Each structure stands twice: as structure tokens, then as C-alpha cells.
């Protein structure tokens, strides 16, 4: 089968790899769609890989084309599925509480083992969810980031019956999906989205968000002054020092601030903002990954239900590419991230069968 292999930093090429033997609890999934995540950009071009060679890709959907002998009646050949990419140990304290995202010894498709930038992938059947009727494979690939957003919004403690104000810092794919999820789950919530890219904010306005463009120091400072202590909840999704500290400044007394993105540098919080956290009694909480299977609030079930009932994350797909185009595309995404070149894109979808 063909795979896009990261052989070293900044080097991804398509190679033929032998099919792996199917284990008893696995299903062979022929991959139909895989999203490129910002973590793939860092892993592929920012030196963030755990090992080489690596097949990346963890936002994926496909069709089951073979069953391991112990899969039983859970799935059938021909089922369209999406993949929860985290493989928990099922033995640690977190796993015993079904908090699989906090597993201390987890494995992961696309980072700690080979993932979906390939024609096929053998996936443990526990990690598969059947796509509801009418959900496309493109939307199926984006269930994973949608579930991550659902989890982050849940951490924000938005009150359903209250007219509350939420600020989302960062209008990437996650931020734009977050606007739509909030609109579905919390119609009384006023959503404000902040970013430095106008083309992303124009999209957000279609979904009913109030937007602020902060592409200069002056516009950023004006935003901080205008909205000081203005929001009941803040979700940080940009991963910059400026947005992390801004969340403290724009939060109301008693507000909850959700930190949801990885940092590429150390975060130093000025003493005045530490004092603000204390005086306003702000809650700062982290969010990572999503809740999956076995709990009353399964983010994946919520995400699938939203998509089955009209949410269309695939509408944010900027382009669809094949395996051979992954290297050049991730290079462009990385250069945009480090502000070397401009590349206006929200979500790129890989279709390995192209």
C-alpha cells in the first residue's frame, strides 16, 4: 500500500509499504479522508516527531474492508467509520475512571504509531465509531477535531439558559467550528471571535459571530481596552503568548478561561495579571483531546449527533489533496505559521485514494 512517510524533519514522501497482518481485534480500514492538523505541521516541519520514519494523520475516516476474527458483530465490511486516535492502556488510574485522554501510558495513531496518511490502516475495533446514515466521509474525518471542540466548550461552563458572552481567541479550524457548536448547543450565548486574519473572520460572521480583527498592535490594544473584564467565558485556541494573557484581561470576575492550544515558547504571566486572576477569582482550566465511550457526556457522541443534524465541518475545507501533495502542503502551512509566507487555508483534507 502507498503511505506518505515522514523520514526526517521536513521530508515527507510517498513510499510502498507492505500490508500489516490484521490482529484479532482490528478492522482493516481503507482510508477515504484525513485532515491535516496543526500538530501534523509541527510534527512534520517543526521537529516534533517522536520517531522516524512515521506515517502521520489522526483525523480520519474510511470504509471497513476486512475484519479481525474477534471483532464479532460490532462492525461489518462496508461500514463507514471514523477513528478515535488515542489507544489507552486501560490499566492506569485515569483509564479505570474512563478518563482515557488522561491515560499515562497511551499510544496514538499518527504520532506514537503509524496513522492515516496511507491507503489503509488496521484499527482496533474499540477505536471505531460507525458514521450515521447521511454523514459524508469528509465530515467523518472531521469528527475528531469537532469532538475536541465540543470538549473545550464543555470546559467553559456556559449556562444554557443565561444570556452569556463567550470570547474565542483564534479563528482557525477549531475556532470556526467552535462558533457553530456554540450556536447549536447554546443559542442564548453571544459569541465573539478574535483573530489577525480577515478572511477567517469573514467566514465566522456567516455563522453569526461578532468578530474583531487584531492585525496590528494598535487594534490589539484597542480590543483589550474595549473588552476589559467583559466575558463570562474565554476559550484560547491560538497558542500565542498574547492570546493566553489576553484571556485573563478580558474575563469577567468569576469567569472561566479555557486554555486549549499548545505553546511553542514559555509563557510568562506579568505580576499585574496574576493579581487580576486573584482579585477577579478567575478559573483557568486546561482542555485536551476529548471524552470517548463509557461516560454520560461522550464528546464523540455529541459531535456525531451535531454533524448528523446539520453541522458541516467539511464546509471549512479549503482544499483536497492526494498523498503526494502532503509534503508541499505542510511546508506551506508551516511557513505561514512562522510568518515566512502567506498561505490562506483553514483545513486541508487528504484523500489517499486520489
Residue ranges and their predicted role:
Residues 198, 245, 298-354:
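C-terminal hydrophobic helical "lid"/dimerization subdomain
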